[in-house]
Amino acid sequence: MAFVKRVTQETNIQLALDLDGGSVSVRESILGKEYASGDGQTIHVHTGVGFLDHMLTALAKHGGWSLILECIGDLHIDDHHTVEDCGIALGQAFKEALGSVRGIKRFGHGFAPLDEALSRAVVDFSNRPFAVVELGLKRERIGQLSTEMIPHFLESFATEARITMHVDCLRGTNDHHRSESAFKALAIAIREARTPTGRDDVPSTKGVLA
């Protein structure tokens, strides 16, 4: 499990993450909320940006994670700082929760449809952060979320998680569907990359991931 607290003049974020879907908690909610504790998968996302909450809930659900993420951001300006900082904080938590990349596949890929939309995601726990995100979104906003911030969120996450990711929406006419299928595909890819191999080794011919 990982816990991250990030406080700047633009955002106040805290999150708890368990990549195996175990119990997670925060000592005190910055939003004054109470979360029931349990042994099963727990997901509570409150960023102040509804569609971002929806995407992160899908990512956690299909990735098999337990996640509590709270953010108070300067949304009176716009959504940029909130979305970017949530990506940074989630990436930091992911890296901590993942730990040493030993005895796992390292590479993963996933496809996810949502009605007419189909997305593909490929990831590498390479310790070499890079993100290519091509979603082909046409709307300026989906709900309260600027569509330009969706790839930026994923880029921020990849940078702090120190993973390589390629996320592409292959087809689709509805931007909500295109985005959601992309996050679900990413969840599937990450879950596959974490699959144990049964060997206690670093999955690299170099012997290190760098």
From Swiss-Prot:
GO process annotations (BP): L-histidine biosynthetic process
EC number(s) on file: 4.2.1.19
PROSITE patterns per record: IGP_DEHYDRATASE_1, IGP_DEHYDRATASE_2
SUPFAM superfamilies hit by this protein: Ribosomal protein S5 domain 2-like
CDD domains: IGPD
Catalytic activity line of the entry: D-erythro-1-(imidazol-4-yl)glycerol 3-phosphate = 3-(imidazol-4-yl)-2-oxopropyl phosphate + H2O
Record key words, sorted: Amino-acid biosynthesis, Histidine biosynthesis, Lyase
InterPro entries xref list: IGPD_sf (IPR038494), ImidazoleglycerolP_deHydtase (IPR000807), ImidazoleglycerP_deHydtase_CS (IPR020565), Ribosomal_Su5_D2-typ_SF (IPR020568)
Pathway: Amino-acid biosynthesis; L-histidine biosynthesis; L-histidine from 5-phospho-alpha-D-ribose 1-diphosphate: step 6/9
Domain of life: Eukaryota
Molecular function, one GO term: imidazoleglycerol-phosphate dehydratase activity
HAMAP family in the record: HisB
Similarity annotation: Belongs to the imidazoleglycerol-phosphate dehydratase family.
UniProt cross-references to PANTHER family, sorted A to Z: IMIDAZOLEGLYCEROL-PHOSPHATE DEHYDRATASE (PTHR23133:SF2), IMIDAZOLEGLYCEROL-PHOSPHATE DEHYDRATASE HIS7 (PTHR23133)
Protein name according to UniProt: Imidazoleglycerol-phosphate dehydratase
Organism: Candida glabrata (strain ATCC 2001 / BCRC 20586 / JCM 3761 / NBRC 0622 / NRRL Y-65 / CBS 138)
